[in-house]
């Protein structure tokens, strides 16, 4: 092991087992953290169907599986990654759904990972080849000309427009990029949001199907509690 070989300091490893929770759980025997594919599968279904009331139950139900193999497991939560269709494509390029996905990722229990380009709303499907889900970042509004020449025929060229660049989104208070930044700051500001246990809400949960678009939970840590509420539907609640 790292420490047995003389390694010093903290060492953090994340494993990838691309399957449902019951198949992935045994791998916690050898690794402290695993990418959480079940998290994205459940969240994607909830967003595609506008139904949030089952989300917390779905997430909490898998935790005992992991605990069977490792008491200090770390869920490396994520949306899509480099081997899957992009989040933007899975959510129909809906800006609102992508914003909810980002907000849920950064307010749920786990150690979240953000796949590059996700914070800009990139889309792409594996059926067109790996390049379509691995588009490089367009940093400034003027950079699309160079990128267009090197990436032509490998990605959806509509992504290389000035409006989707980091520069443009950084200047737009309502952009997806700035939403990611806002929730990242909140997570870094409040330890309960970063490290707290996820607890089901007593009212807005899987038993309340009359308000099924709502997903709500508490994050709890050292006597502190924070309420998290998300609306997965189209109508205001």
Model-predicted segments: where are they?
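The substrate-binding groove and active-site-proximal loops of carbohydrate-active enzymes
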Residues: 1, 44-53, 83-93
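Active-site neighborhood of glycoside hydrolase catalytic domains
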Residues: 1-21
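Loop/helix patches that line or flank the sugar-binding groove of alpha-linked glycan CAZymes
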Residues: 4-9, 57-60, 72-78, 86-236
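Intrinsically disordered, low-complexity regions
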Residues: 11, 24, 28-31, 134, ...
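Glycan-processing catalytic domains of CAZymes
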Residues: 15, 21-70
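Residues at the C-termini of beta-strands that transition into short coil/loop
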Residues: 17, 38, 79, 141
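Short loop/turn segments at secondary-structure transitions that flank enzyme active sites
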Residues: 19, 41-43, 84-85, 143-145
């Amino acid at each position: 092991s790292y420490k047995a070989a003389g390694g010093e300091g903290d060492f953090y490893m994340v494993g990838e087992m691309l399957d449902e929770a019951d198949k992935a759980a045994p791998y916690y025997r050898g690794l402290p953290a695993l990418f959480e594919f079940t998290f994205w599968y459940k969240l994607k279904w909830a967003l595609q169907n506008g139904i949030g009331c089952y989300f917390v139950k779905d997430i909490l139900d898998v935790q005992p599986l992991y605990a069977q193999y490792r008491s200090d497991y770390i869920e490396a939560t994520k949306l899509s990654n480099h081997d899957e269709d992009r989040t933007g494509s899975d959510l129909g390029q809906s800006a609102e759904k992508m914003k909810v996905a980002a907000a849920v990722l950064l307010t749920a229990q786990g150690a979240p990972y953000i796949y590059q380009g996700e914070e800009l709303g990139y889309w792409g499907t594996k059926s067109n080849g790996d390049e379509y889900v691995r588009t490089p970042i367009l940093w400034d509004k003027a950079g699309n000309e160079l990128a267009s020449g090197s990436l032509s025929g490998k990605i959806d060229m509509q992504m290389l427009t000035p409006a989707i660049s980091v520069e443009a989104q950084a200047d737009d208070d309502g952009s997806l990029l700035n939403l990611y930044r806002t929730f990242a700051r909140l997570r870094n500001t409040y330890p309960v949001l970063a490290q707290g246990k996820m607890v089901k809400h007593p009212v807005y949960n899987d038993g309340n199907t009359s308000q099924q678009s709502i997903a709500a939970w508490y994050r709890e840590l050292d006597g502190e509690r924070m309420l998290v509420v998300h609306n997965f539907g189209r109508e205001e609640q």
